[in-house]
Structure formats: structure tokens, C-alpha cells
């Protein structure tokens, strides 16, 4: 099953620009992963795998995020290990290194094993929507699509131009249901649309 959602990122983009002016440069993808881990901790069913042989759902205490990446020989999914223990800057640095190694065919087997949840950022390719394929035996895969400038209604009921990103999450309906998926993405969207929420989570 696939659930579709969107997030208005103007506040996040402005905050990232402010951080860059202060000498802290990082990709939006790194912020996505940092906040995604917080949402996964609150909704652990999505940080699980299905052991079909033993008919058991295994919840994981480790947060190993698979990064769907274009490589010379096709799609590959290196794994960012222990994402919950890393800062946004550390995540950004490790993501760039894993991507570089993937594009240069330098990944080792251990770099591809152990993922508990996968994220695919296809926005730079121009995608505005798709039904992603789950990286079994994981429970879900989240695809991030293109951010587009669109008219939005602000909190004070004004019309403004916003930076709207669409996303789609496919999940194994044997493990999680639609209500759980909506609650999970709603929590993540809260932190995307209001980056101050991340600060509150880390206090």
C-alpha cells in the first residue's frame, strides 16, 4: 500500500539559509533523515522487518537508514548506520561519502547490509509522484519528490507562494495499517514544516 503526503518547506529552507550564513552548511536530505529517525522512534513499527520464515515482526533498536542511490550500474542502497546517534552535520558528511563511494563503485558488502528503513530522494530527478517498491524485508520505503513553488494558504488565511514537497511511502500492509502510516508521516511533516520542533525534541 502507498500513502501520499506533502509538506510546505518555506520555514525549513529559510532556516537552512540562516544556518549557512552562520557557517553551518548541510543538505535538506540530512535534516530529513534526522527528523525521520525521531518519527521512527515514536512509530517503531516502521523500523521493523518481517521474518516470514518464523512469522515474526522484528522491531529494531538500531536506526540504519538505507539511501537509494543512482550508481553507474543502476540503483544501489548503501546504509547509513546508527543514524540516531549522529548530528545533522555528521549525517550530511556520511551521506556524501556513501554517495561518492556508490558512484565510484567503492562500496563494500557491509555498506549495503542491515538497513531498517529506506529513503529515496528522487526530487532532483524531477519526479512529482510515484509508488516506491519496498526494500524487503523492511516494512516501508519513503520517496521524496520534487519541491515546487505553489500557492498556499498561510496560518493567518493569506495566500502566499510556498515551497511544497510531495512524498510517497509504500508500506507492508501485513505489518502496518493506513492509520499508522498517516500518523507517522504527519509527525514527520510537523518537523519539516516547523524546524523549531526539532530543537524542542533535542532539549
What are these regions (language model features)?
Residues 1-203:
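C-terminal catalytic/motor cores of large multi-domain enzyme assemblies
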Amino acid at each position: 500500500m502507498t500513502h501520499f503526503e506533502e509538506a510546505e518547506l518555506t520555514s525549513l529552507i529559510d532556516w537552512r539559509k540562516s544556518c549557512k550564513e552562520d557557517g553551518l552548511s548541510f543538505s535538506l536530505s540530512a535534516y530529513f533523515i534526522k527528523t525521520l529517525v525521531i518519527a521512527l522512534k515514536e512509530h517503531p513499527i516502521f523500523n521493523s522487518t518481517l521474518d516470514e520464515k518464523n512469522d515474526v515482526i522484528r522491531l529494531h533498536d538500531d536506526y540504519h537508514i538505507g539511501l537509494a542511490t543512482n550508481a553507474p550500474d543502476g540503483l544501489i542502497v548503501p546504509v547509513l548506520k546508527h543514524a540516531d546517534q549522529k548530528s545533522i552535520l555528521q549525517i550530511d558528511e556520511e551521506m556524501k561519502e556513501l554517495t561518492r563511494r556508490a558512484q565510484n563503485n567503492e562500496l563494500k558488502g557491509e555498506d549495503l547490509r542491515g538497513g531498517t528503513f529506506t529513503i529515496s530522494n528522487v526530487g532532483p530527478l524531477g519526479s512529482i509522484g510515484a509508488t516506491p517498491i519496498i526494500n524487503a524485508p523492511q516494512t516501508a520505503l519513503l520517496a521524496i519528490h520534487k519541491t515546487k513553488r505553489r500557492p498556499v494558504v498561510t496560518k493567518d488565511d493569506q495566500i502566499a507562494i510556498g515551497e511544497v514537497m510531495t512524498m510517497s511511502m509504500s508500506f507492508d500492509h501485513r505489518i502496518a495499517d493506513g492509520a499508522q502510516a498517516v500518523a507517522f508521516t504527519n509527525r514527520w511533516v510537523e518537523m519539516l514544516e516547523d524546524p523549531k520542533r526539532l530543537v524542542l525534541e533535542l532539549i
